[in-house]
Amino acid sequence: MKRFICFFLLFAVLLCPAASAEPLRDGDISISAPSAILMEKYTGEVLYEKNAHERIFPASVTKVMTMLLIVEDIESGKLKLDDTVTASARAASFGGSCVYLEEGEQMSVDDMLKCIAVVSANDCAIAMAEHISGTEQLFVERMNRRAEELGLEDTHFTGCTGLFDDGEHYTSAYDVAVMSRELIGHELIKNYTTIWMDSIRGGKFELSNTNKLVYWYQGCTGLKTGYTSTAMYCLSATAERDGVEYIAVVMHGDSIESRNNDAKALLNYGFASYTLCPLRGAELPDIPVELGRSGSVRCEYDGGEYALVPKTGAEPEYELTLPER
């Protein structure tokens, strides 16, 4: 059936805000990290960027992609949360952030994913990569294919943990925001990334989230921290309030405190300054047709469901313009 496109004009009471948000310039907000970005989830609008396409070693923020592949396999039915994963000698040998898997130790996919999301467990990331693809190398090849599918031009992975900087493992704040947006599109992951404290092994091993925003930032939904001496302090922070969700990525911060403060400043700006306006509230009338096979055709919505508009103190309005018959 032939479709007619409906065009929307968004109006405030006194001024007409742009349907797409106007990004902040560097200097409009104080961000100490050398690279950062603020993106809105539903529209993908970028509200702030600072050296957002600079290639940087991301440390454990790498695991945003690792978790994305795991969650996609769970939701496609390739994996089940109660599947058993057996730790190899290689997985058990990994240090850094870990839960001290022993060779041959068995753990469910559910617990493995929890450990990756909450404490950034390198050993669990390796165990899951081997369980899914046979070897970490094959899993990493899949990570890079997925990055290409997402259009990430400044990303290349050589491992699934982000523990080692070999000069060929890099991403950018923008690319992290895009893959984070894809990940939080799967509500399942928030069952893990919003955990503050939990335990595994029947309560014998306690877990405490490396992302402290989960505890003290209202609406925080995740997502992933990272640190090495070369990557410094990195973070992809996500938060949702009143139906609007933002992704704040901070790369190469000089401390946990400054990293968290930068993310908080970006998220606060987003929540204070913008809102989502739904564009598909009204039922569309049929359009009369002259000299056609039928007397009318159905008019269907085309384009996005929401527009991100500045908060002006007034309720956003939209005007629906139908095409000529």
Indicate residue ranges for each PLM-predicted region:
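Positively charged n-region of N-terminal signal peptides that target proteins for export
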Residues: 1-9
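Basic side chains
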Residues: 2-3, 41, 50, 63, ...
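A generic structural signal for short, solvent-exposed coil/turn residues
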Residues: 5, 13, 28-30, 77-79, ...
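Hydrophobic core
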Residues: 9, 13-17
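Residues in and immediately flanking transmembrane alpha helices
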Residues: 15-16, 76, 278-281
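Active-site-adjacent loops and short helices of periplasmic peptidoglycan-processing enzymes
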Residues: 21-174, 178, 183-185
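Domain-terminus/edge residues, biased toward the C-terminal soluble/receptor-binding domains
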Residues: 152-156, 164-325
